Amino acid sequence: MNMFDRPKIDGHCHVLDPVRFPYPAEVPYHPQGQEIGTADYYTHVMDAYGTRHALLVGPNSGYGLDNRCLLDAIAQGGNRFKGIAVVRADISKQALKDLQTQGIVGIAFNTSFHGLDYYADIDPLLAHLRELDMWAQFQVSANQLEALWPRIQRIGVKTMIDHCGRPNLADGPNAPGLQALWKLADSGLGVIKISGFGKFSETGFPFDDTHEHVMKVWSGFGPDRCIWASDWPHLRGTYRLDYGTLLKLTERWFAPAQLQSMMWDTPAKILGW
């Protein structure tokens, strides 16, 4: 099957529409130029590459705690989109339920962006997510997961890890963050996104230096807990990345049965399509 025609679900992308939904002034970074991708434009990208559904992630860059653009895209997209929102740590359980009714399936925690201290008081929120059967989505980098893992394990919240865990490859395979990642894999609480290679590659496209780690992620989590994602439109990217080239790269690294699992079967089951 042609890779571009293969039915797929994109497990991590962003929509930004500063004309209809201006960036809040208090958010320090405002994406511009090719970083901007409206929901309308993204649906054309989806149609061009056979992407049937997508998990939209509220971006800390640009919107921060403002979920209006995200929720509008879900509402206007029929059943094509579900979302991961960004919220305050003290959000009520009822407010989370209200977000659920609008297509939100989880909450994003970006320690790579904010640091660990910013999330010091999230235990009650994680407990709410567990009780509501929602996802806690963590974007970590280097060894940050080492500090988060005991809380995840104690609370028992189901956890989604962005971008293969974003290790520091120079730290080697025994890095504390990687050891925590494999503990999460063994626990059965976690799923992981096969995505964001450029966020931890030291050599750039075609990200050959990440291949060994990506294969370990696939083996460690297994086909039932790995989902593919594009990370479109590549916020804060330092060089150009295109949807099609990322698809062809993934096709080179994985067999057809593996692609079927990560691009359709597993995300459809996990995300409810």
Map each language-model feature to its residues.
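Generic structural signal for well-ordered alpha-helices
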Residues: 39-43, 67, 71-74, 93-97, ...
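Catalytic pocket-lining loop regions of alpha/beta-barrel enzymes
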Residues: 105, 119-227
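Alpha-helical scaffold segments that flank or form the walls of functional sites
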Residues: 26-77
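Hydrophobic faces of well-ordered beta-strands that scaffold small-molecule active sites
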Residues: 9-13, 54-58, 81-85, 107-109, ...
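Active-site gating/metal-coordination segments in enzymes
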Residues: 61-144, 193, 197
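Mid-to-C-terminal alpha-helical segments outside catalytic/metal-binding sites
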Residues: 1-9, 32-53, 215-216, 221-227, ...
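Conserved, mostly hydrophobic/aromatic
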Residues: 12, 46, 70, 99, ...
